[in-house]
């Protein structure tokens, strides 16, 4: 069963390097789609004596995916600032939430770029697939949430019309 979930317009810090003086060139859950390497990642290839001269302090923290499944609740935050709302689709397929975003080649400050990504998240047991909602913040953070089926059953039903 496939259920489309509309994306409605409506901080996260990159993990630190595993060892001092070492900068890993990216992690599995980093959501920096098509942004290239950081200066710190390039500087890790330089000798330690000259690397500090090439580094600038980061002005903003880089976002990562943040997934939470506490107590059967499901929540995902993704940075999709490089995509327009109509370029993003969120749908529920069986017990998974699938996120797809794509934009055609367009100019940027370095030339031209095209981006595309797919993410698939398994819903935890007890979460109602029909309760999945998504919203896009003005800053470009996609929020996907769902509550346990038991929490849906406890919600009061609207009064019947007379």
Curated annotation (Swiss-Prot):
Cellular localisation: Cytoplasm; Nucleus; Secreted
Keywords, in A-Z order: Chaperone, Cytoplasm, Nucleus, Phosphoprotein, Secreted, Stress response
Pfam families referenced in this protein's UniProt entry, alphabetically: Crystallin, HSP20
GO MF annotation terms: protein folding chaperone; protein homodimerization activity; protein kinase binding; protein-folding chaperone binding; structural constituent of eye lens; unfolded protein binding
Gene3D superfamilies, A to Z: 2.60.40.790
Gene Ontology terms: biological process: chaperone-mediated protein folding; negative regulation of cardiac muscle cell apoptotic process; positive regulation of angiogenesis
Origin: domain of life: Eukaryota
A Gene Ontology cellular-component term: cytoplasm
PANTHER family hit by this protein: HEAT SHOCK PROTEIN BETA-6, HEAT SHOCK PROTEIN HSP-12.2-RELATED
Name of the protein described by the UniProt record: Heat shock protein beta-6
UniProt organism field: Mus musculus
Gene encoding the protein: Hspb6
